[in-house]
Amino acid sequence: MGSSEKRSKDIMSDIPTFSAENLQNNLKVIQNSRTFLSIIAGVLAGIIGFNGLIGFVFYFVVMLITSVGLMAKAGFSADLYFDSWNRVLFDGFLGGLMSFVLFWTFAYDLVHIF
Amino acid sequence: MNLGFLVGVFGVLILSHAAYSTIQYRGLLKIMEEEFSRPPINVILELIIGLALCMWAALTFPGKFLSIHPDSDENRAVFLPDNSDFMIFNHRGRLFPPQIDMKF
C-alpha cells in the first residue's frame, strides 16, 4: 500500500500540468501570424521580381524575422507560454511555403507579365 | 476592429500601391525599350514600410499569448460554480491527495 501510493505520487509529480486550452491558443496565434506573413512575403517577392532560389531565400529570411518577433512577443521567456523553444522558433516554418509560392507567382504575373 | 487590423489593412494598401507603381514603371520601360533590373527606390521603400507594418500587424492582431501554467496569476479561479451542493470532497479520492499547488 505504501509503495503503490508512493509510486502514484511520483507519477503525478513527474508529469507537468499545462493548460491545454491556452497552449492551443498560443499555437493558433503562431500559425496565423506565420500564414499571414507568408502571404505578404509572397506578394513582396513577386513585386520585386525575384526568380528561382532568391525567392526561397527571401522566404526563409522573413520567417526568421517572424521567429525573432514571436520571441519578442513571448518576452524572450518561452517557458511561460510554450512547452519548448522549438514551438516559438521553428513551428510552422515550412507550413506557409505553399502559400508563399502561390502569392509569389500570382504577384509576379500581375506585375511583370500581364 | 482594432489598431492591429487597421495597421495590417494599411500595410496591404501600401503594398498594392507599390505593385501599381511597379506596373507603371514596367510600362515606362517598355516605351523606353529597356530591361527591368529592379524596382525604383520609392517602390523599394514602400515595400519595406509595407512589410514592417504587416509584420507588426501579424504579431499583434492574432491575439496575445496566454500562460500555460495552472498556478500563474492569469489562470486563477476567481469564482466558484453555482451548484455548490454538488461539490463533494468526502469521497474515496481523499486517499490520494493531489500534488498540484492550485491557488484559489
Swiss-Prot record, chain B:
Topology within the bilayer: Multi-pass membrane protein
Topological domains annotated Cytoplasmic: 1-2, 62-104
Subcellular location per the Swiss-Prot or TrEMBL entry: Endoplasmic reticulum membrane; Golgi apparatus membrane; Early endosome membrane
Topological domain ranges for the Lumenal compartment: 24-40
Record keywords: Endoplasmic reticulum, Endosome, Golgi apparatus, Membrane, Transmembrane, Transmembrane helix
Membrane spanning stretches: 3-23, 41-61
InterPro entries: MMgT
GO cellular component term, pick one: Golgi membrane
Quaternary data: Component of the ER membrane protein complex (EMC).
Family listed: Belongs to the membrane magnesium transporter (TC 1.A.67) family.
Role, per record: Mediates Mg(2+) transport.
The protein, known as: Membrane magnesium transporter
Species of provenance: Arabidopsis thaliana
